[in-house]
Amino acid sequence: MAARKGRRHTCETGEPMEAETYDLGSEGPSQVYLPGRGPPLGEGEELVMDEEAYVLYHRAQTGAPCLSFDIVRDHLGDNRTELPLSLYLCAGTQAESAQSNRLMMLRMHNLHGTRPPPSEGSDDEDDEDEEDEEERKPQLELAMVPHYGGINRVRVSWLGEEPVAGVWSEKGQVEVFALRRLLQVVDDPQALAIFLRDEQARVKPIFSFAGHMGEGFALDWSPRVPGRLLTGDCQKNIHLWTPTDGGSWNVDQRPFVGHTRSVEDLQWSPTEDTVFASCSADASIRIWDIRAAPGKACMLTTAAAHDGDVNVISWSRREPFLLSGGDDGTLKVWDLRQFKSGSPVATFKQHVAPVTSVEWHPQDSGVFAASGADNQITQWDLAVERDPESGETETDPGLAALPQQLLFVHQGETDLKELHWHPQCPGVLISTALSGFTVFRTISV
């Protein structure tokens, strides 16, 4: 990707910027500002946006913050790069009171790219710019349905032509909601008004399971078997859902046994119908096969995958790699062909707080993104290596210490929780945080 150029970028307070150089005067050489590592900003200094580092950058708020969301695949086509973009998200709130929570469908559209700085011109040109700015304003349509209790995780799947959302509630239930009507109304302002007035209060889940012994966060739909679902709770239990005729599910009451603490994340294999991975607060990552009895289904285990809780995992759709992020702030890449060894093939330590989300790029096999409680989103490429024969060396000691595979550091969010690459819009990354949603694409990916 020619745009990478070996440059690394950061942003703060919602404003992306290129890595900034500070002159320390006679006390030493200039240094590049590194998130979480300094040098600290001086009095009156702040980080400002460098729009040239971003192809696309938009923010949105929905009232109560959302701990989790998922991208809804649409019928607008794949490999969409032409701007403006349109996209659909399904998200769940974490409101202050249980009865104030909502499951939401968002339609974000008219998402234009970043613009070069304005040049000096006549008053007529200024008027044209104002009219153009009005036409370029991003738009948001929002359909909401009541949900009693905060929503810990949302995952969307298509059952044939029917979109559904699996929803983990802080009240200990897992519910499935039909999304067809919500998708219809966010495309039609008149239908949306009727829905909000007459229908939204009556929307109920099409299925609910209360067999978990408490709340949980882990949930994943099978990408190979429509309707097959896994849910994991904070009591170390994992349950398998099997779809039945008539739009219902049979949930196996026998949990998969192996973890000793909370199950934090689940990922189905993208290549095998019966295999899945799990990670836990017990520091382990496990590989399972549902063809075996739940008590004997754990086939492979790395007992000490991280120094502490393993928070998130992502199974590559293109390579036999599993990506993990933990409370120790590290990112690890596991080659599943060598998983028995218990050693990752790559370890990266850029985040200075727990990793909250990881995901492989859906089109580029070596690229992934991660978010952390340090309010950083990092983009990585395993294929990037410094050429020792080029003679090029990094003169700044701060940059020299950074992993070669680190492409981009995005900041400016508060309390980052989750991120996803858009599967139909290459390079577009979406995140949710206490500060709201951010949709962006960098020059690096």
Curated annotation (Swiss-Prot):
Biased-composition ranges, Acidic residues, are 121-134
Name where the WD repeats lie: 211-251, 258-298, 305-344, 350-390, 411-444
What GO MF annotations does this protein's record show?
chromatin binding; DNA replication origin binding; histone binding
One Pfam family named in its UniProt record: WD40
Keyword Phosphoprotein among UniProt keywords: yes
Q: Name one GO cellular component term.
A: nucleolus
Q: Which residues carry this modification: Phosphoserine?
A: 119, 122, 343
Describe its function: Histone binding-protein that regulates chromatin dynamics and minichromosome maintenance (MCM) loading at replication origins, possibly by promoting chromatin openness.
Q: What is this protein called?
A: Glutamate-rich WD repeat-containing protein 1
Q: Which organism is it from?
A: Rattus norvegicus (Rat)
